[in-house]
Design a protein with these regions (language model features):
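Alpha-helical transmembrane segments of integral membrane proteins
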Residues: 14-24, 238-258, 295-303, 337, ...
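Peri-transmembrane interface segments
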Residues: 35-39, 208-253, 262-266, 287, ...
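Short beta-strand boundary microenvironments
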Residues: 41-42, 65-77, 81-147, 159-161, ...
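Small-residue transmembrane helix packing/gating motifs
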Residues: 46, 124, 165-205, 224
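Interfacial "coupling" helices/loops that link adjacent transmembrane helices in transporter permeases
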Residues: 238, 252-294
């Protein structure tokens, strides 16, 4: 400990370098944590339906009954919705959103779980209200209680108060009641979509084939397929993490190699004296390299704090339209970062131990 604080410049250089290594690791693992889990959350915790059905035109009462009669084929619950692309108008820019209007006689709770980013449940909007995806609201500076305007391709507008900002990771949605839509658009919503929950043990793909055979059905979309498609797109994050780990390893090697050489060069006489006193080579090496281990541990701890801020900065620079990230770092990622930093240190120390001591 005396030698560590005796050479203060080397102390700060070592801690700064190793903290940078640890911070890179936290950032790499944090990016993976923030990206890889969003697809699963979107299709298991937010959009909880299993199949989306799209009709060519507004459904008729007969078509509604036809879907409801599919219970023996595995349809547990279903709800009809109107889905329409509109522009959400902000003070400085507009963003494209998907407007979801539910059948007034239906309960949306089993199909879409509306909640805040902190997990607080949000009730489906009443007349004159809307619930908006948190990401698009943040981009436009919209807060709960604000009045916003939605505009379609025919320049017709809907003005509503924001009753809640819901967590959503894939695409941007605005949820609206049928009463609000009818009152302001002067027409009934076109219910051309249906959300379907399948019974336990039912193969969604087989049921989807059966639904596709119904009258006027244009498309059937399986949520599991969407989840797998987005997951494969996010698979490149593992490569990014590997690259960051290699960069962190390179940084650790450069810092430890150079500072260890400086340390030994400055203390040649001291090391020679220890050897003359009868210390074995391993004992002499441990005397020198023990300082590296202590400084590495201190640097790794400092890097955890630095890594949190670096991770937030990196995620703020990753902007993907229609996709929001769950910005967080899992506790196990901090453990991985410290362990890998110590492993890098051990490897470099083993590599340099004989070479450096012999040169001394």
């Amino acid at each position: 400990m005396r030698n560590i604080f005796r050479y203060k410049k080397r102390f700060f250089m070592m801690v700064a370098g190793i903290s940078g290594c640890s911070a890179l690791l936290v950032t790499g693992f944090g990016v993976r944590d923030s990206v890889t889990g969003i697809v699963t959350q979107q299709y298991t915790q937010i959009q909880t339906y299993d199949i989306g059905v799209t009709y060519s035109s507004s459904v008729t009462p007969e078509q509604k009954s036809e879907l409801e009669s599919k219970e023996q084929d595995g349809v547990e619950k279903s709800v009809f919705v109107a889905e329409k692309s509109m522009d959400l108008v902000g003070s400085e820019k507009t963003k494209s959103v998907s407007l979801i209007v539910a059948d007034p006689d239906s309960d949306m709770t089993p199909f879409v779980n509306l909640h805040t980013e902190k997990g607080v449940p949000i009730t489906f909007p009443k007349k004159g209200e809307a619930v908006i995806s948190a990401k698009v609201a943040d981009e436009l500076g919209i807060k709960t209680g604000d009045t916003v305007t939605l505009q379609d391709s025919d320049m017709k507008t809907i003005s509503v108060a924001v009753s809640g900002l819901c967590e959503n990771f894939v695409y941007n949605y605005v949820y609206l009641s049928a009463d609000t839509y009818e009152e302001q658009m002067k027409t009934e919503p076109e219910y051309k979509n249906a959300f379907v929950c399948v019974s336990e043990g039912t193969d969604a793909h087989l049921l989807g084939t059966s639904l596709m055979a119904m009258s006027d059905v244009a498309a059937v979309n399986i949520s599991q397929d969407d989840m797998e498609r987005f997951s494969s797109m996010m698979g490149s994050m593992d490569l990014i993490v590997v690259v960051i780990i290699l960069c962190a390893a390179g940084l650790a090697f450069i810092v430890l190699y150079n500072l260890t050489n400086i340390n030994i060069t400055e203390r040649v006489c001291e090391i020679a004296t220890i050897e003359v006193l009868g210390f074995y080579e391993n004992e002499t090496a441990a005397y020198v390299f023990r300082e590296n281990t202590i400084l590495t541990f201190l640097g790794a701890l400092a890097g955890l704090v630095l890594g949190v801020f670096l991770h937030r900065f990196v995620m703020s620079q990753i902007v993907v339209d229609m996709v929001a990230f769950d910005v967080h770092v899992k506790p196990v990622s901090f453990v991985y970062s410290v362990v890998l930093t110590l492993v890098f240190t051990w490897f470099v120390d083993r590599l340099m131990r004989k070479r450096s001591m012999r040169s001394a």
